[in-house]
A protein has these predicted regions:
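Extracellular glycan-interacting surfaces
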Residues: 1-352
Length: 352
């Protein structure tokens, strides 16, 4: 149980999409005071923050992925310093810790590249992705830059790693990220199911991979060899736009899914809306969580305070942030204190 004097801070990264890259930002919310602050000192101008990590043992340490590479803060986001990598000046879209050693980090880039650091981000080395062959259906379309939008490792076998590629399918590594190949067999071989937005593995289900796409949630047994569509309440006819997936840090049987309607694989004209889903049996069954509101934009991400697991948070792309301090039974709402647009909406969220 968390100490009663533990203060939770929520961090959200803002960025644009496509040609709408004029704005961005990083904001911190203090749950104890209800105050928002901009936390961009040391970050690049108009930072496009698409990835955030918070150290599992020291919540003062944060990592941010920006359009100019990765950054680190040692004081809860008050100040940031750039981390030197061999791929300077490129967009970082995902960050992940080794499940048992937070000194080991992985960074996923656009265009598709994966780097690893073994000393808390001080030094980085490029992993081998040269053998990756993307699904043909994603290559004959108008050119789409393959970006690594999600990274994870199997907690029971960290040498087994997975990378979600937006409009590119799933990559797998059997050697701790040293080399990668494409995993494209099974259910999710149509174009709209190859547009991945995240990947997770739970310690309660070793060897089972969960991926989210613009139309559905899928499960791949036997390290992604056999895929099946997991049913949730559809947000539009034919599916749900899934953007965030989280395994609770203190309970590997508990999972949350951020989903929505509008855009992606939804029929033209579908109005945007967001929803939060929860599974208490490692993804076997899902229920929609009553957060007391229907956000007018797609739900984007979920975060749980590792030191106070009753504190659950979720956010919608256009700035709505929902907070529960009783395991999701009751909720309150706040909003990022800036105007949202296509050039600025929420990408990542972490807390601690």
């Amino acid at each position: 149980m968390a100490a009663t004097n533990h203060h939770t801070y929520i961090y959200v990264g803002l960025a644009g999409e496509g040609q709408y890259l004029a704005e961005g930002g990083l904001y911190r919310y203090a749950a104890s005071t209800g105050e928002w602050q901009s936390m961009t000192q040391g970050l690049p101008p108009t930072p496009q923050v698409r990835a955030l990590l918070i150290h599992p043992d020291n919540p003062a340490v944060l990592y941010a992925g920006t359009q100019c590479g990765p950054y680190r803060s040692d004081d809860r986001g008050e100040h940031w310093e750039a981390l030197e990598t061999p791929r300077e000046g490129r967009d970082v879209w995902s960050l992940a810790f080794h499940p048992h050693d937070p000194e080991v980090l992985y960074a996923g880039y656009e265009p598709c590249a994966i780097y690893r650091s073994e000393d808390g981000g001080a030094h980085w080395r490029k992993m081998h992705t040269d053998a990756v062959v993307f699904p043909h259906i994603t290559t004959y379309m108008p050119p789409v830059c393959k970006r690594v939008i999600g990274l994870t490792a199997d907690p029971g076998n960290p040498s087994e790693m997975y990378a979600a590629i937006e409009v590119g399918g799933l990559l797998g590594s059997r050697d701790g990220g040293e080399s990668w190949t494409s995993l494209i067999d099974g259910t999710y071989v149509r174009n709209n199911t190859l547009d991945l937005h995240g990947v997770q593995v739970s310690a309660a289900a070793p060897g089972v991979v969960y991926i989210i796409t613009q139309v559905a949630l899928f499960r791949g047994r036997e390290r992604g060899r056999h895929w099946e569509h997991i049913q949730i309440d559809e947000m539009f006819p034919g599916g749900s736009y899934c953007r965030g997936l989280l395994v609770a840090p203190n309970d590997p049987t508990l999972m949350y899914l951020a989903a929505g309607a509008g855009g992606g694989g939804a029929p033209a004209g579908t109005p945007e809306a967001g929803a939060l889903f929860r599974s208490c049996d490692t993804g076997e069954t899902w229920e929609r969580v009553d957060i007391g509101d229907t956000p007018p934009s797609r739900m984007a991400q979920i975060a749980i305070d590792r030191a106070a697991p009753a504190r659950v948070y979720c956010c919608a792309q256009r700035g709505q942030v929902y907070m529960s301090h009783d395991h999701g039974h009751t909720w309150q709402k706040t909003h990022v204190p800036v105007e949202m647009s296509r050039s600025r909406h929420i990408y990542p969220m972490v807390c601690g």
